Swiss-Prot record:
This is Small ribosomal subunit protein bS16. One of its GO terms (biological process) is translation. It comes from the Bacteria. NCBIfam families: S16 (TIGR00002). GO terms for cellular component: cytoplasm; small ribosomal subunit. Disulfide bonds: none annotated. It holds the Pfam family Ribosomal_S16. Belongs to the bacterial ribosomal protein bS16 family. InterPro entries: Ribosomal_bS16, Ribosomal_bS16_CS, Ribosomal_bS16_dom_sf. Keywords: Ribonucleoprotein, Ribosomal protein. Gene3D superfamilies: 3.30.1320.10. GO terms for molecular function: structural constituent of ribosome.
Length: 81
């Protein structure tokens, strides 16, 4: 099972925010998730990023691969270098 850390879109039409979740790579974008580790709201100025650092490091140590966008967000949150 290939596990990814990725964004799950939430919110209303034209008003999105995203949850940073751990999911199997074969599930749909908004499908079933394994764990939720934070959220990202791009509409606030500056963008609102909240990550549970302990959970994120745990899943990265288990071998979960972040998507390109999530990797940038984790760097901004100080989880990875």
């Amino acid at each position: 099972m290939a596990v990814r850390i990725r964004l799950k879109r939430m919110g209303a039409k034209n008003n999105p925010f995203y949850r940073i979740v751990v999911a199997d790579s074969r599930t749909p974008r908004d499908g079933k998730t394994i764990d939720e580790i934070g959220y990202y709201n791009p509409l606030k100025n500056p963008a609102d990023i909240k990550v549970d650092v302990e959970k994120a490091k745990k899943w990265l140590s288990y071998g979960a691969q972040p998507t390109d966008t999530v990797k940038i967000l984790l760097k901004k949150a100080g989880v990875i270098e």
